[in-house]
């Protein structure tokens, strides 16, 4: 009987450790702010990458008018659509990216608590490493289920090359979602979702898992110099982006079909096969170099996230710093 109070107190502490609303909210804020800042910075590169990926499936871009590469795309966008068109779809992208990245980071830490409970890094290194991979992949897949319609709309808005309102396919985020939902139903907003889940797990598993693992091996992760953290994050985002890029290309091609009377691809597998047969393996990586440049923004997100969490004094037992 005398040991009852301490036991209840311990159970209460464990329960709080599994979900702390305050730290969870701060985690969302830290990840969201970092994501919004970096995404706005690399928006022009983001749009170039997107156009290079989907131009072969776009009804607005004829074969002879397709962009020849990154430089050609960068030069023609302001000339044909206006300078501000570099940021076309950026507002939708920020709206999408804020909850996406914030949920990724927040859930990742919660998944780490579940996957890594009782795991000793020194004695069970590979189990610890796999737990990092699993937490990153699970976080990405979970958040994708919530924000996929926004990602879909952002893709369609970014791929819209009309110069004036009368030439544009969609007037904005709301118009895009309403038109697709009206023509194809809610299912139309989830076109390419299956391959997206596959790609996001591959990307997030390496993105979060490798970053946490490398930082966790440093003597004092909390005291790591900003440039060292940025270099680690840059390598991680570059490798993760290249590894998952074919999945990203296919999912965006599938997104371009919603609302169209004629479908170019019957499904994900058919899309993979036709791209390979008709355009070659290089088509899967079209715009990949711009994606590497864009990855600088992703690396900045990881580093800013750690710094913002430090400023907010967040300590939830499993941060991106690899504590």
UniProtKB/Swiss-Prot annotation:
GO cellular component: membrane; mitochondrial inner membrane; mitochondrial permeability transition pore complex; motile cilium; plasma membrane
Annotated binding of ADP, by residue: 96, 108, 251
The record's note on its domains: The transmembrane helices are not perpendicular to the plane of the membrane, but cross the membrane at an angle. Odd-numbered transmembrane helices exhibit a sharp kink, due to the presence of a conserved proline residue.
Protein name (database record): ADP/ATP translocase 4
Protein topology in the membrane: Multi-pass membrane protein
Cellular location(s): Mitochondrion inner membrane; Membrane; Cell projection, Cilium, Flagellum membrane
Native organism: Bos taurus
Entry similarity comment: Belongs to the mitochondrial carrier (TC 2.A.29) family.
Cross-referenced Pfam families: Mito_carr
Gene3D superfamilies named in the record: Mitochondrial carrier domain
Subunit note: Monomer.
Placement of sequence motif Nucleotide carrier signature motif: 251-256
PANTHER family per the UniProt record, alphabetical: ADP,ATP CARRIER PROTEIN 1-RELATED-RELATED, ADP_ATP TRANSLOCASE 4
Region span, Important for transport activity: 251-256
Known regulation of activity: The matrix-open state (m-state) is inhibited by the membrane-permeable bongkrekic acid (BKA). The cytoplasmic-open state (c-state) is inhibited by the membrane-impermeable toxic inhibitor carboxyatractyloside (CATR). Proton transporter activity is inhibited by ADP:ATP antiporter activity.
Chain ranges on the Mitochondrial intermembrane side, renumbered to this chain: 1-23, 116-125, 216-226, 306-323
């Amino acid at each position: 009987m005398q040991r009852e109070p301490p036991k209840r107190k311990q159970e209460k502490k464990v329960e709080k450790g599994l979900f702390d609303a305050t730290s969870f909210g701060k985690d969302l804020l830290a990840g969201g702010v970092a994501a919004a800042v970096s995404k706005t910075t690399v928006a022009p590169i983001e749009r170039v990458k997107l156009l290079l990926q989907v131009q072969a499936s776009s009804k607005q871009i004829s074969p002879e008018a397709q962009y020849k590469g990154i430089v050609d795309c960068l030069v023609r966008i302001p000339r044909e659509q206006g300078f501000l068109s570099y940021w076309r779809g950026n507002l939708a992208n920020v709206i999408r990216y804020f909850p996406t990245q914030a949920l990724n980071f927040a859930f990742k830490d919660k998944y780490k608590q579940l996957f890594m409970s009782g795991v000793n890094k020194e004695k069970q290194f590979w189990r610890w490493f796999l737990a990092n991979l699993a937490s990153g992949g699970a976080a990405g897949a979970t958040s994708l289920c919530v924000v996929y319609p926004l990602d879909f709309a952002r893709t369609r808005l970014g791929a819209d090359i009309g110069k004036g309102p009368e030439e544009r396919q969609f007037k904005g985020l709301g118009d895009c979602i309403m038109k697709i939902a009206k023509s194809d139903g809610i299912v139309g907003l989830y076109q390419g979702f299956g391959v997206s889940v596959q790609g996001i797990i591959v990307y997030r598993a390496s993105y979060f898992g490798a970053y946490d693992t490398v930082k966790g091996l440093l003597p004092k992760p909390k005291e790591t110099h900003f440039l060292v953290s940025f270099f680690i994050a840059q390598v991680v985002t570059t490798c993760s982006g290249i590894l998952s890029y074919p999945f990203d290309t296919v999912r965006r091609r599938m997104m371009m079909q919603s609302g169209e009377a004629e479908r170019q691809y019957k499904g994900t597998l058919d899309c993979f096969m036709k791209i390979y047969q008709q355009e070659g393996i290089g088509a899967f990586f079209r715009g990949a170099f711009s994606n590497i440049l864009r990855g600088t923004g992703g690396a900045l997100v990881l580093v800013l996230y750690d710094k913002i969490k430090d400023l907010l004094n967040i300590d939830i037992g499993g941060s991106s710093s690899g504590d």
